[in-house]
């Protein structure tokens, strides 16, 4: 009898400890027991959509439930983000968003329908990829130094194409001009494809474009690569220097994608989803596929991603305020 009581006492103590520690076993028992909706706040085929569809098979295998991708595009990802913010915080609605969704929009919009810093629990920063400073083949500058020199000798004449006002490529150009104390003209397009097409055609001079979107054009000689915005050279473009190597300090910039759930989601579910996402992202075949598309897998913890998100908000808020950019 005493032995039975001792065993029961040990089990009770272990269970109590699990509750106090907030472990998934104690807090998320039975989760998930129905399909999970994964919001993508952009149209199909973009970086966030690719990231979502790359991990859903792994998540389903790990957690034993279907993960349904639901595209909710519009308002520079605000429609999908607002839908997540207003959803029940039970772990059955999550979202993959971008640097714009989770950081830039907070600094850019005067009246944003959601608050990236208050409305979400962050799960993991999934992937990141640098931008490449590219120039039209006919543009006279072929290095960063030549571009800066040309811009200073021809103030306000260099045209910077971007995928839209407030995009990471637009703000990379703004930050570049701040760092180099040079000037230029922003030419926003409705998406990166149109910007790249006009850049190749020589209608605009330079642009900071996503590595995956321009590397084939660079290798084909249709665009000139001046520098990469990452903290190291890209394996696929080993001859292209980083901006730091080109003499531009404090300008490491990555576009990135990450996962979040609504604020108030139980901590155990947050941890369970985060660990499952990290495992799915680190699957060798998934990682190889993402790398082939120009992504670097990050797969960090909720705490690391939340801290990074706050640092990114502050950084881009400083850049945007200095440039006096604001959208309604």
Residue ranges of each PLM-predicted region?
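C-terminal lobe and pocket-closing loops
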Residues: 128, 214-283, 311-314
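Bacterial Sec-dependent N-terminal signal peptides
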Residues: 1-9
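Solvent-exposed, polar/charged alpha-helical surfaces in well-ordered, non-transmembrane soluble domains
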Residues: 53, 57, 61, 82, ...
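C-terminal segment of classical bacterial N-terminal signal peptides
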Residues: 13-26
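N-terminal (or domain-start) structured segment
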Residues: 27-119, 157, 165, 181-206, ...
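Hinge/capping helix and adjacent helix->loop/strand transition within the periplasmic-binding protein
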Residues: 86-92, 99, 107-194, 243, ...
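An extracytoplasmic/periplasmic, membrane-proximal ligand-sensing/linker region
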Residues: 33-35, 178, 182, 219, ...
């Amino acid at each position: 009898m005493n032995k039975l009581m001792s065993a029961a006492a040990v089990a009770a103590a272990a269970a109590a400890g699990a509750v106090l520690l907030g472990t998934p076993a104690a807090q998320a028992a039975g989760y998930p027991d129905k399909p999970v909706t994964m919001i993508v706040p952009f149209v199909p085929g973009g970086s966030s959509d690719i990231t979502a569809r790359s991990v859903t098979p792994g998540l389903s295998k790990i957690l034993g439930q279907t993960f349904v991708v639901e595209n909710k595009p519009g308002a520079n990802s605000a429609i999908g983000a607002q839908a997540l913010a207003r959803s029940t915080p039970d772990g059955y609605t999550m979202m993959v968003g971008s640097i714009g969704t989770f950081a830039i929009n907070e600094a850019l919009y005067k009246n944003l329908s959601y608050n990236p810093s208050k409305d979400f629990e962050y799960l993991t920063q999934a992937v990141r990829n640098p931008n490449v400073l590219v120039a039209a083949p006919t543009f006279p500058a072929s290095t960063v130094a030549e571009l800066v020199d040309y811009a200073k000798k021809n103030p306000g004449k260099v045209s910077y194409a971007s995928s839209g006002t407030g995009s990471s490529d637009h703000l990379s150009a703004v930050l570049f001009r701040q760092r180099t104390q040079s000037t230029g003209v922003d030419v926003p397009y409705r998406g990166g494809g149109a910007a790249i097409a006009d850049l190749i055609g020589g209608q605009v001079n330079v642009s900071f474009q996503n590595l995956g979107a321009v590397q084939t054009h660079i290798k084909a000689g249709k665009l000139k690569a001046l520098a990469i915005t990452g903290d190291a050279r890209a394996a696929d473009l080993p001859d292209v220097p980083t901006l730091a190597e080109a003499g531009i300090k404090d300008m490491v910039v990555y576009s990135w994608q990450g996962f979040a759930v609504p604020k108030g989601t139980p901590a155990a579910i947050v941890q369970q989803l985060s660990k499952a996402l990290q495992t799915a992202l680190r699957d060798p075949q998934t990682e190889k596929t993402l790398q082939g598309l120009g992504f670097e897998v990050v797969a960090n913890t909720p705490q690391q991603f939340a801290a990074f998100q706050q640092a990114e908000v502050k950084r881009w808020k400083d850049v945007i305020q200095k440039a006096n950019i604001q959208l309604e």
